[in-house]
Every structure is written in C-alpha cells, then in structure tokens.
Amino acid sequence: MKEMMGVVGIILVVSSCCLSLLDAQEITHPTDVSALQYVHRKLKDPLNHLQDWKKTDPCASNWTGVICIPDPSDGFLHVKELRLLNMNLTGQLAPELGLLSNLTILNFMWNDLTGQIPPELGNLTHLIFLLLSGNQLTGSLPQELGSLSNLLILQIDYNEISGKLPTSLANLKKLKHFHMNNNSITGQIPPEYSTLTNVLHFLMDNNKLTGNLPPELAQMPSLRILQLDGSNFDGTEIPSSYGSIPNLVKLSLRNCNLEGPIPDLSKSLVLYYLDISSNKLTGEIPKNKFSANITTINLYNNLLSGSIPSNFSGLPRLQRLQVQNNNLSGEIPVIWENRILKAEEKLILDLRNNMFSNVSSVLLNPPSNVTVKLYGNPVCANVNAGKLADLCGISTLEVESPATSSETISTGDCKRQSCPVSENYDYVIGSPVACFCAAPLGIDLRLRSPSFSDFRPYKVSYMLDVASPKNLGINPYQISIDTFAWQSGPRLFMNMKIFPEYSELNSKFNSTEVQRIVDFFATFTLNTDDSLGPYEIISINTGAYKDVTIIFPKKSGMSIGVSVGIIIGAIAFFLVLSSLALVFFIKRSKRKRKTREVDMEQEHPLPKPPMNMESVKGYNFTELDSATSSFSDLSQIGRGGYGKVYKGHLPGGLVVAVKRAEQGSLQGQKEFFTEIELLSRLHHRNLVSLLGYCDQKGEQMLVYEYMPNGSLQDALSARFRQPLSLALRLRIALGSARGILYLHTEADPPIIHRDIKPSNILLDSKMNPKVADFGISKLIALDGGGVQRDHVTTIVKGTPGYVDPEYYLSHRLTEKSDVYSLGIVFLEILTGMRPISHGRNIVREVNEACDAGMMMSVIDRSMGQYSEECVKRFMELAIRCCQDNPEARPWMLEIVRELENIYGLIPKEEKPYSSPSVQSSASGMSGFAVASPRSSYTTFSEFTANQLVSGVIPSIAPR
C-alpha cells in the first residue's frame, strides 16, 4: 500500500509540474530531466549541496552545478555543464550520464565517488572536459572513452583505476591534457598514443606501468610535459629521441628502472626541468649545454661517473642541482659563477655521497642564498673545523624542501582602521587609495607539474599574468597570493585572493562578476607561461559571497506557440509514463514480497578519512569480519604489540592480512587517519603495502597484502626442512636494506623504523623480502619550521638484542640506530644464531671468532656450499653495522651498494629464481625457495640500489 501511495504521489507531482509549465517560458528536455534524476539517485549528499535537485525542472530551477543552453532545433533547454566539484559526494556515477547528449563539461573532481567509470560516457560526443580527479573510482578505463572526439582535457588522476590503457584513447585527436597519474594502471603505454599530436601534458606518474619506455612518444609535436615517475619499465634506456622533442619543457622519469646513459638533451631548447633520478643510469653527464631556461637538474641515486660539466656554471636560471649518491669525481665547477642571484632566488647544490676529493676556495665561500652539501665525499674525511666542515657537516643532511610561504603583508597605519577580517574582508595591498578594505573571492588552485623548484622568483610575474587582459583583465593590485605550499609530485598548491576594484561606494563584487571569475577558472581559461604547467581548481572559497546566488544565464528564445506545444507534448508524455508505472506496480504487487535486511554500514557509515588519503580502501566491519571467519582462531596468523593478525579472504580472491588493534593500542581517529595517510604514501617493492583500513564499531584495523612465506624468522628456524642458500640469504638481506633505505631517504617525512628484526621482514610468494611494522610513531622529528632534525627522542619500543646500545646513553634515535638493528639481522642470516640466547650475545660471539681467525666456525652449517669470499665480505659488513659507535657504522646507501657488489660475485647459476611458495613442513603459512644445482635459474635483477618510489599525493587536496 505504501508503494502504491508512492506511485500515486509521483503521478500527482508530475501532473502538477506539467500544469505549472503553462506559465513557464523554459523547460528542460525530458531525457535530460530523467538522466539527472538517475544521477541524483546514485549519489549520496551528506552536506545537502544538492538539496535543490528535488525541484521539478533542473534548468528553470537553477539546480546546483547544472548549467543549461537552449536548442533551437527542438525548443528545449539542454544540460551543457555539470559542475559538482568538491561537494563531499559519495555513491557512483550513473550510466544515465550518457544520455546528456549536449554535455560539454563533466566535473566530479575531489569527491568520494566509488565504482567504475560507466562505458556510457562514451556517448557524450560533445564533451570537452572529463574531470573525475580525486575520487575512489576503480576498474579499467572503458574503451568507449575513445569515442569522445571533441575531448580537450581527460583528467582521472588520484583514483584507483587499474588495468591497461585502452588503445582507443589514441582516437582523441583534439586532446591537450592527458592526466592519469596516481592510479594503479598496469602494462605498457601504447605506442599508438604518438598520434595524439595536440597533447601538451602527458602525466602518468605513480602508476604500475611496465614494458618499454616508448620512443614513439617523441613524435608528439606539441608535447610540453612528460611525467612518468614511479614506473617499472623493463630496464630500458631513455630513448635518444627524447632529446629532440622540440617544445619539451619538463621531462620527469624519476624511479623508472631505467638503465644506460643520459641522452643528449641539448636540442631541447626550452627545457626547464629534468628529473631522471633514482634509476640505474651509467656513464658520464653529457657535456653538451642544457637549455638556458633550465631550473632543475635531478640526477641523484644513479650510477653516474666522471665529473660535473663545467658549462653548468653558465645556467642563468638554475635553482637546484642534485647529483648525490653517484660516483662522480673531479673538479666541482662554481655553479653560481658569473651570475648575480636576486634576493628572492635560491640555489641548492647537493653533491653528497660521491667521490669528490678536493674543492676550490671559491666553492668554500658560497653566497648566503646558495646551499652546498658535500657530506659523504672523500674531501670531508677528517675535517673538524673551518668552512669546509660547514659544507661537510651533519646539518647538510637535512631534507631540503622547496620554499613554502605563508606571508603576512604589512599594512602600516591601516591597523588603526576597521577591516572585519572575521567577516572575510581584508586590506587590498597596493590599491590606489591606502587602506582599502574589501571582500576577496578565494581560489584554491594547484599547479599540477610546475617546471621549477622555487616559486618565489615567479610569483609576481604569475600574478601579473593572471590579471592581464588575456586572462581576468583586472588591475594587478586586485590579485594576492599570500600562501603557497609544495606537495608531493612535486605539485604546487596556492591560495589566490581576488579583490574587487577600488571604489568609494562598494567593497564587494556584484554577483555577475563573481560568476565571471568562477567561470574563468572552472573552464580552464587561464593562459600562462609553459613553465607553470597545467593547473586545477581544488575549491572556491566564496567567503563574504556565501549568500550570493549565482544565476547562470539561459535564453530560450522560444515563442509562446512553441512553448505551448512543448508543454502539451510533455503532459501527454508524462501521463503515458504514469499509466505504465501503475500497470507495472499492480503486476509487481501480486508477487511474493521479499524482506530485505537493513545494511548496518548505512546506519554507521565509514568515517570520512583525511583529505589527502591515497590508494587505500575503507573497509566496513562486516567485510573484514566475513573475510576472517569472524576473526576466528583458525584465521589468526600472528600477534604483535599492535594486536592480533588474521588472514582474510576478500571477494574476488584477494588474500590479505588484517591487523586488529587491541584495546590498549587504539588511537584517536585523527591520529589513526594520520598514520593511514602516511602509510598510503609509501610505495616500494621491499615494503609491505597497506591496502586499506577499518574504523568502525570501536575497532581500528589495518589491511595489508598477505605474505604467504611468513617471515625471515620462520625461514631461519631449525623447524624447516630445507635451508636457505647463501644466494637467497643475500637476496633477502639486500631487499631488506633497500626497503630501509627508502624509509630513510625517500619517505616524506623520513622514517626511522626502530624495530628491525627477522620477524618484521616478511617474504612474499617469490621469496622477495618486504619490511613490515613501520608507522607514525617512528617519523623523523621535524622542528617548528618543518626541517628535519637528525634524531628522534621518543620512547623505544624495540626488541632487546636489536636496540642500538648508543640509545641507552643518549636516548636518541638516528638512521644509524636502524643500521645497528639491521646488522644484527645480517649476523642472524649468516650464523642462524639468535641475538641473545642462554647468556650468549651474537655480536660478542662473532667478534671473538673473527679475532681468533675462526670466522667460518660460526657460519650456519645448513647453508650448504658457499663462496668464502662472499661470506667474508658479508660478515665484515655486518660487523661494521654493529659497531657501538654510530659514527663507525656505514650509512644505509653504503650497505645497499656493498650488498649489491657481494651479490654480484655469486655465479649466475647459483642465484635463486623467483619460485612459487613452497610449503613448510612446520607451518602452512611459511615456505621458501632453495637454490639447487639442478634447478633452472634466472639472474635475480629485480632490485637496484636506486629503485625508490616517491610519494604521490597532495598534502592539502581535499580527499
């Protein structure tokens, strides 16, 4: 009966709507109305942004975010744009969006939408902007998107899109912006994309791309920015053709598993930004001159040799040269020579951990706005005082972040006058009359791929550009940028205030001007210098204009006769539709009704995570309860200080490990989400990946990838049938060291693990090691200005036997504390002994054996045959790591390189191949691969010292 009443109600409402149209001059096409109603049903609107979508006619009633235009051919109004940016919407994209045949802009950016992208969007052949960034969309990109022949901007970054790139996207011949970064897209970039001749910006960083780096991309004549960081290409070289892309402004291939030499880039005459760091590049830095526009050269974490070219000193705009962690030597050129640095300019030269043995006197006296870092070079050996000591000092290890600004501009005597800041007013600096107080419109925008490392020299010219006649066409004093901040990528967030023009009568924009400014930014009309790259709107802060109703102009141009005809047709259409609905209900009511259970998760939805969450899924309690058989004892696979760990089976066959916090380990919700945010940014093949979380029903759980071969502690246990070969032990040691190196040098902020031990080194199905149990409590401390301190003074939760002995004296933790713990693990790998057992100390036992010339007597006999040279060098490295004096211990990068050298001594036929999990006789959750003389092998080359994955997510973006 209730359902019958609903149908009758609908009929009455429809009839009323149709009759009310007799007084109207405008009406939305019924197909568009129906489509938007379906869209609304698929969405959840917790903040009621779409409350006016309950009105009858979308265009006539000015539905929020809906912009319409008349179509003279049928006399109806049609939906032209759908702007639903940053409205905290959840739910899914309705397939019925494909019915909005006149749609040109579809903008759902920075919401929390889930589900897949409907293939029906391929029907929107008039679409020019497809903007879906910053949601939680999953699945593959539909092939049907290749039918969007008029598309200019394809922006689906910061989602969870997987699968391969469809070749059909090569049909988007008008496309200018291809933004698919920060997803989980796999496979190779289709070479067919080289036919996208109008693409300016190709951003695919932080995905899971493999295969070759296509040389065909160099055939894109309009290409300005190519950014593919964080890919895992198959050890390919950088194509030489990339050095001849005529308009290339930025080339960013950081951490892409690239090999070979650096190509000649001298033909890239407008190149501003080069980042090919964290690869396996070899040879020398090319001597050919870079573009005079170059601001940033990042070559760090490679295998480069030779010297720094002398012509680097002739680069007038250079802001940052990073060549640390290579094998460079020779004379260091004075980069700032023949250059006058302005007060707002800054130059950073990071030369750490190379082979430089001498420096010139000029280099020892850099200007105040030049930073030189020499730590870890031979020239720094035994330096205790003087200017060289300053360049070699520990302070040069600080993480140097690009400049961030939050300025307070002096207003002089204006403070004596009244300007109600609390009411979103502010002084307009530089206005024709002093102390002009006005209400600005706030625009939060982000430069997606800027081609510089320091914004300050560009700030004034950027504001002038935005104000210029080709853009907003306002006075320069009407624009202010008093806050900007760098985010991972790197990307640049800024808050721009736009003030009304000076007037004695008014200090606010009228609604028409507010609408013009909003339209200007929302339709990507801003035209600026190529070095700034593409931009996106994060949010629009209306401030004092919250009560302003922004009316979108709609001129139907319909005659009364046409309107009446449309109304009569619409009434007939809706009456037929209503009759069909009644017939359907009567038939349906005769069927047996099925009761449906109320979903508890709808009553207790997942709390909204922080704005900058990335690549992790929020699970509800029911999902994890079902996956773990109600957290049964049979599902439990471990227990730690955080709580119990369960093996879970999620729909689709995904096997996970669920860490369930015990009562004493629960955090505040803010702290819990902060930890998730940090962990979600950490991506390295030797770190256990966080897949999701749950914060429901008083529970806090973390969902990780499942490691079927258990831990290193399991593999070293005497309970297991088959021992580990030396080659496999070295491989595990090397992978573990690489994971720790990433935490120390590439995590943002850097992390000290504090509890490295065999049980926290897990083994996947191919026996690849993954470091586990690192979290927010282990962050390297930052001072008030965001600068890294060289130690942490929190209470240690480490395990006895692995804790740095220096800590008990200084109560300080440093990266060298992790080095000590890892050294103990190395000794366990070599000897099979526990760190402390029956009064015996592993460090003391090993040192005594080595001093007596009996090193081999403590080697684990289950290792089988092995190379004594490899064992000796491995043991020497382990002992160096376990020195009581932290200064005597090597840095993690040195450890990785030495292990690579030792592993290189292992004959190819003895190296372990990547095998499937081998079940142990002792446990169903652990197993290991064993090198056998009769086995079929492939060389283990999955890791390099420089395969580091940088963080990818914005730290301010609304997520």
Curated annotation (Swiss-Prot):
<feature type="active site" description="Proton acceptor">
    <location>
        <position position="755"/>
    </location>
</feature>
<keyword id="KW-0723">Serine/threonine-protein kinase</keyword>
<feature type="signal peptide">
    <location>
        <begin position="1"/>
        <end position="24"/>
    </location>
</feature>
<feature type="glycosylation site" description="N-linked (GlcNAc...) asparagine">
    <location>
        <position position="358"/>
    </location>
</feature>
<feature type="glycosylation site" description="N-linked (GlcNAc...) asparagine">
    <location>
        <position position="62"/>
    </location>
</feature>
<keyword id="KW-0675">Receptor</keyword>
<feature type="glycosylation site" description="N-linked (GlcNAc...) asparagine">
    <location>
        <position position="102"/>
    </location>
</feature>
<feature type="repeat" description="LRR 7">
    <location>
        <begin position="221"/>
        <end position="244"/>
    </location>
</feature>
<feature type="repeat" description="LRR 1">
    <location>
        <begin position="79"/>
        <end position="100"/>
    </location>
</feature>
<dbReference type="InterPro" id="IPR013210">
    <property type="entry name" value="LRR_N_plant-typ"/>
</dbReference>
<feature type="glycosylation site" description="N-linked (GlcNAc...) asparagine">
    <location>
        <position position="88"/>
    </location>
</feature>
<keyword id="KW-0547">Nucleotide-binding</keyword>
<feature type="binding site">
    <location>
        <position position="659"/>
    </location>
    <ligand>
        <name>ATP</name>
    </ligand>
</feature>
<keyword id="KW-0325">Glycoprotein</keyword>
<feature type="repeat" description="LRR 12">
    <location>
        <begin position="341"/>
        <end position="366"/>
    </location>
</feature>
<keyword id="KW-0808">Transferase</keyword>
<feature type="topological domain" description="Cytoplasmic">
    <location>
        <begin position="587"/>
        <end position="959"/>
    </location>
</feature>
<feature type="repeat" description="LRR 4">
    <location>
        <begin position="149"/>
        <end position="172"/>
    </location>
</feature>
<feature type="repeat" description="LRR 9">
    <location>
        <begin position="269"/>
        <end position="292"/>
    </location>
</feature>
<keyword id="KW-1133">Transmembrane helix</keyword>
<keyword id="KW-0812">Transmembrane</keyword>
<feature type="glycosylation site" description="N-linked (GlcNAc...) asparagine">
    <location>
        <position position="510"/>
    </location>
</feature>
<feature type="transmembrane region" description="Helical">
    <location>
        <begin position="566"/>
        <end position="586"/>
    </location>
</feature>
<feature type="repeat" description="LRR 8">
    <location>
        <begin position="246"/>
        <end position="268"/>
    </location>
</feature>
<keyword id="KW-0067">ATP-binding</keyword>
<feature type="repeat" description="LRR 5">
    <location>
        <begin position="173"/>
        <end position="198"/>
    </location>
</feature>
<feature type="glycosylation site" description="N-linked (GlcNAc...) asparagine">
    <location>
        <position position="369"/>
    </location>
</feature>
<feature type="glycosylation site" description="N-linked (GlcNAc...) asparagine">
    <location>
        <position position="327"/>
    </location>
</feature>
<feature type="binding site">
    <location>
        <begin position="637"/>
        <end position="645"/>
    </location>
    <ligand>
        <name>ATP</name>
    </ligand>
</feature>
<dbReference type="GO" id="GO:0004674">
    <property type="term" value="F:protein serine/threonine kinase activity"/>
</dbReference>
<dbReference type="GO" id="GO:0005524">
    <property type="term" value="F:ATP binding"/>
</dbReference>
<feature type="glycosylation site" description="N-linked (GlcNAc...) asparagine">
    <location>
        <position position="182"/>
    </location>
</feature>
<dbReference type="InterPro" id="IPR008271">
    <property type="entry name" value="Ser/Thr_kinase_AS"/>
</dbReference>
<dbReference type="GO" id="GO:0016020">
    <property type="term" value="C:membrane"/>
</dbReference>
<keyword id="KW-0472">Membrane</keyword>
<feature type="glycosylation site" description="N-linked (GlcNAc...) asparagine">
    <location>
        <position position="311"/>
    </location>
</feature>
<keyword id="KW-0677">Repeat</keyword>
<dbReference type="InterPro" id="IPR001611">
    <property type="entry name" value="Leu-rich_rpt"/>
</dbReference>
<comment type="similarity">
    <text>Belongs to the protein kinase superfamily. Ser/Thr protein kinase family.</text>
</comment>
<dbReference type="InterPro" id="IPR011009">
    <property type="entry name" value="Kinase-like_dom_sf"/>
</dbReference>
<dbReference type="Pfam" id="PF00069">
    <property type="entry name" value="Pkinase"/>
</dbReference>
<feature type="domain" description="Protein kinase">
    <location>
        <begin position="631"/>
        <end position="906"/>
    </location>
</feature>
